[in-house]
Regions:
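Non-catalytic, surface beta->alpha helical segment in thiol-disulfide oxidoreductase systems
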Residues: 71-91
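Residues at alpha-helix termini
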Residues: 38, 60-61
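Nucleotide phosphate-binding site architecture
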Residues: 26, 48, 87
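Local sequence-structure signature of Cys/Sec-based thiol-disulfide redox active-site neighborhoods
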Residues: 2-43
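Short amphipathic alpha-helix with an adjacent loop that forms part of the alpha/beta core around
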Residues: 54-60, 87-91
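Thiol-based oxidoreductase modules, predominantly thioredoxin-like and allied folds used
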Residues: 41-54, 63-64
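Structural micro-motif
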Residues: 61-70
Length: 91
C-alpha cells in the first residue's frame, strides 16, 4: 500500500512537484523557497497533519527525513530525495 499512497497523491497533485514535510523543518522551508524562485508548483503533505502517512512514504522510498520530494513533470513520478538532492537536481 505504501507506493499506492504516493502514486495517488502524485496523480491528484496537478503540480510540478510533490513534497512531504514536517513541522519546524528548515529544509522544507528552503525547498518551498527554491520552488518559488524557479516558478515551480508543488503539492505539500505535512506528516504532522496526516498520522500514519510517514510510514507509507518511508516504506516506498527508504527516505526517513523531511522533506521527501518527487518530480511529477513529464507525466512521471520520480523520487528525488530531500532538499540537498533537489537543489542539485534543479541546477
Amino acid at each position: 500500500m505504501s507506493e499506492a499512497v504516493v502514486l495517488e497523491h502524485a496523480k491528484s497533485a496537478g503540480t510540478d512537484f510533490l513534497m512531504y514535510t514536517g513541522n519546524f523543518c528548515g529544509y522544507c522551508v528552503a525547498a518551498k523557497r527554491l520552488f518559488a524562485s524557479k516558478n515551480l508548483s508543488f503539492k505539500e503533505y505535512n506528516f504532522n497533519e496526516h498520522p500514519g502517512m510517514r510510514e507509507d512514504v518511508v516504506a516506498a522510498t527508504g527516505h526517513r527525513t523531511v522533506p521527501v520530494i518527487f518530480d511529477l513533470r513529464d507525466g512521471q513520478v520520480m523520487f528525488i530525495g530531500g532538499f540537498d538532492e533537489t537543489s542539485a537536481y534543479l541546477r
